[in-house]
Each structure stands twice: as C-alpha cells, then as structure tokens.
C-alpha cells in the first residue's frame, strides 16, 4: 500500500465498497453525532466522509483531530446508511469506516475558517492566502484559470501560432505607465525595466522572419491602484502576425476568444459574428469605448428638439455650436418615483441633476421638461426614441467631451435599475477606428491616444497633412459585458512614418532612437507589414468565473497598496545589497 494514499478524496464510488483504502488530506469538518465522529476529509480532488465510532480502533485518535489538521486515514469503504446519501458530492453514496489515523501535520488555531464561504477582511485573506486558497470557490477559480489558459494555448496552436518566450529584463520605454526598475550591479547608475508588455520584442520577432507568435506573457506596470486592475503584474495572451490586414487578425482571433468563452460559459450565450463598432459611434451610443451590449439602451442626440425651445437652460446651451443634448431612453421607467431616484443618483455623482420626461398611459409627456417644451416637441422626442406609454427618457446637456462619461454611467444605471441587462450572455464586440492622438489637458499637448506603435489610417500622408486629432489608427479593442478584454493594432512598420508619428507627440528622432533603438534599427533592414493584439487573461478568467474582483482569480495578489502581505513585499534590503548596487536612499520626509 502507498505510504500516503491509494485513492484521492474525490475517487471513491459504489464500486469500491468493501475495499480497504488509504486516504490523506485535510480535516475539512468534524462532527460529533451522538458519540459517532464524522470526519469530512478533503484534498485537491474532493471530499470523503470518514466515520469513527467507539468500536473503531482509531476512535481515540479521531477525538483529538481539529479542523485543517493533515492526516492519513486507513479504513474500509461501506455504503452510507439509507437516507443519508449526499447527492451534491461525487463520493456521496459511500463513507470510510476508520481503522487507523496518522497525523501528518497538525494545525494551530485558524485565523479564518476554510469550511464555509464566510466573508473575511481582505487583509486577513491575503496574509493567510494559503488558507484562503483551500476554500472551495477560490480553489475552483484557480483551477478554472489554469484550464482557460490551456484552452487558449490549444486554440492558438490550432490557428497555426507558435509559442515564444521574450525577456523579462528589458529597457525602460514610454508605453503609458511607470516602469518597475531593476538596478544593474554591473553597470552602476543604469537600470533594467520589467516589461509593461512584450510589445517591441514581438514586433522584432516579425522582423526576424517568424510568423504567428503568441505567448501567455507576464506584464508589469507601476500604476496607482485601480478597481479594475491588480497592482504590480498581470497576464495577457500576446499575439503578433506578419503580412496581415486588420481583417486577417480578426479572422484568426475571433474563433479563439469565442471558443474559450463557449467552453467555459456554463450555459450562457456567447456572441457569434461579433459586431464592429466605430469608436466614435460607441462613445455616442453608449458613452464608453467598452460598451456593455447586454444593455439594449442606445443614447441619441436630440439637440434639434430643444433648440429654441421653452426650456431655456438647454436652449441657451445649444447656442454654442459644440454643445449637444443627448437622450437616454428608459423603457418601463415612466414613474415619478424612478425618475426622482435617478435624479438623486445623478446629484450623488456630482451632477446638478438629471432632466427627464415620462410618458403617461394616455401617451402625454409629463415632468418639468415636457411642461417647458410643449406637447409637440415631447411627442417628437418620444417618436425619435421609439418609446411608448409607461416609458421615460433622461437628458444630459453641454459639451459631449465633458459629459460623455457621466452619460455612459447613467445609461448603465438605467439599464441596471430597470432590469434590462441580460445576465445570461457574454456580449462580445470589436471596437475599431480609435483616434491616433488625443489632447493631453495636463501637459497641454497632443499625445498618443493608445498604442504609439499603431499604423495611422492614411499612413504618412495623414501624418503630414491632417490635423492630428482627426487621424484614426488601425487600432481595435475587444469588449465583453462592459470590460475591455483585448487591445491591438496594425503596426507602423515604416521608420520614417514611425519617426513622424512620435514627432507629432513631442518626441524627437534622437529620443526615438534612444528609447526604441533595437526596433528602430530593425526597421532599417526590411520590416514586414505586421499587427497583433493582447487579450487580458485575468479579465477573461474573471468574467468566466462570474466574479468582479480580480483577486478572486489570482493566486497570490497584492492589496490595493501594492503590498504582498503574505511574503512581506516590498521590503527593506540590507546596506550591503544597496552598496553592491551603488544605491543611496533619499527617502521623503514623513513629518
């Protein structure tokens, strides 16, 4: 017999009855029913009920056991008594009558229980992550994550992609966020950077004559805490292809992502034949570049119905050409209570309020806006929005560039409050035609909107003749249920176009050479047209596991202060280590 087990805790069935077995695992739960001890023994594979009564030679040892002790149990498999089967367990028809117990690892008093799924403070869960990971839901999420990554790999290889590994120590580059820097001992005063993404390396692979690259790549960004991103590191399905158009990339990747979602959707519908939505249309209809298409609400520009109207607040705004009035339809929301609730919500979001019109059963409009603009305009708005009696519409006005984010939040809020969002669906879409540049209000200059290596639509001619803020890029995102889950683009593979693109964003040619020297040199020796994308592994897993917290699908995450409470990172290092790296600390004054 094996030293520790003949079977796992998830293996025993009716066919094993009367067999002598050996199991090892953790004491998940111990119950005393009238002097009979029931030990639920758990391992990675499942749970088995073990029974010790006073006649068992191991009863005295069983009485000493406590939760989460690691034990070896020998015993005989028997049928559970009639009426005590547990249909929720694969092993629920049998139990093990205990004949011998060996304690392999006793456990101290638990700072959080493993049995049950009680909510515990995050700092406790992260400090004792090894206990937290024993809990069923989190443990299963981590296993699902591994299966999803396996599925991604398999599907990428079926599409003809080959997996590569790119360096972790690289050069610092301006890709949007701060780099994590690693000091060089051999080169005093110089630093490596952990890659924010394998962007340059994967493009260099295309210039090296390879094709169809992919990698499950760790990425590192020293960013301030955000609700939708873990501090420190994240993983992406990184992809690059040579001699391709945007449509070629869509054709290769849409089946991969669709297939992964279908495999793990647990019965939810998955979009087939993804819609392609232009960035400008997405912002106008949904108020965001990552629309949740489960929500059927589409916003409309209804400025013409308020221009010159009796509602002077909007009418005066519309005298300025840049201002508009957008409507957010609210099907079924035509009650004063709901409209007042939305108005209060808007005020809580820092807005002066949220104008509304509701249509009563007779079809007439009601509310302050309807009273001011009159029945003819009110009816025209209802017709334009396709609304009926019992519906409502909410309105935002001003400069769209300033109110669009709030309008998107309002659309989501209306959809949630009116139960319009289809929770049994993964709604996937491409968002295309992103602007190449945007105006940076902080630095008062034109800057890259997204990836600086993207090809501008119109190429060199667009860079030299168009207003930069009107140039679109061959750049695209994949969105799902309100999350951006992938981003990519066709690359700017001509060196003169690359230099010009960076020049518009305020980078001189020498700075481009200094920062991207390897790739810039490679461009001089025959660079193929190429493009790719990167899909966020963490966000995809989060969606498929049905959680909204990335920590629920990550093994050892940091907290929102970028601290690893289990390992004690970041930590101080010894003076000797600092001297070897030629580093002298200049700490901020904490007084």
Swiss-Prot record:
EC number: 6.1.1.23
Compartments where found: Cytoplasm
Reaction equations catalysed: tRNA(Asx) + L-aspartate + ATP = L-aspartyl-tRNA(Asx) + AMP + diphosphate
Spans traversing the lipid bilayer: none
CDD domains: AspRS_core (cd00777), EcAspRS_like_N (cd04317)
Positions contributing to ATP binding: 221-223, 484, 536-539
Region annotated Aspartate, chain positions: 199-202
A Pfam short name: tRNA-synt_2
Binding site for L-aspartate: 175, 221, 450, 491
Main location: cytoplasm
GO CC annotation terms, alphabetical: cytoplasm
Gene3D superfamilies, alphabetized: Bira Bifunctional Protein, Domain 2, GAD-like domain, Nucleic acid-binding proteins
Site (Important for tRNA non-discrimination): 33, 83
Keywords: Aminoacyl-tRNA synthetase, ATP-binding, Cytoplasm, Ligase, Nucleotide-binding, Protein biosynthesis
GO molecular function, one term: nucleic acid binding
The family this protein is said to belong to: Belongs to the class-II aminoacyl-tRNA synthetase family. Type 1 subfamily.
Oligomer and partners: Homodimer.
Protein role: Aspartyl-tRNA synthetase with relaxed tRNA specificity since it is able to aspartylate not only its cognate tRNA(Asp) but also tRNA(Asn). Reaction proceeds in two steps: L-aspartate is first activated by ATP to form Asp-AMP and then transferred to the acceptor end of tRNA(Asp/Asn).
Record-linked NCBIfam families: aspS_bact, PRK00476.1
Name of the protein described by the UniProt record: Aspartate--tRNA(Asp/Asn) ligase
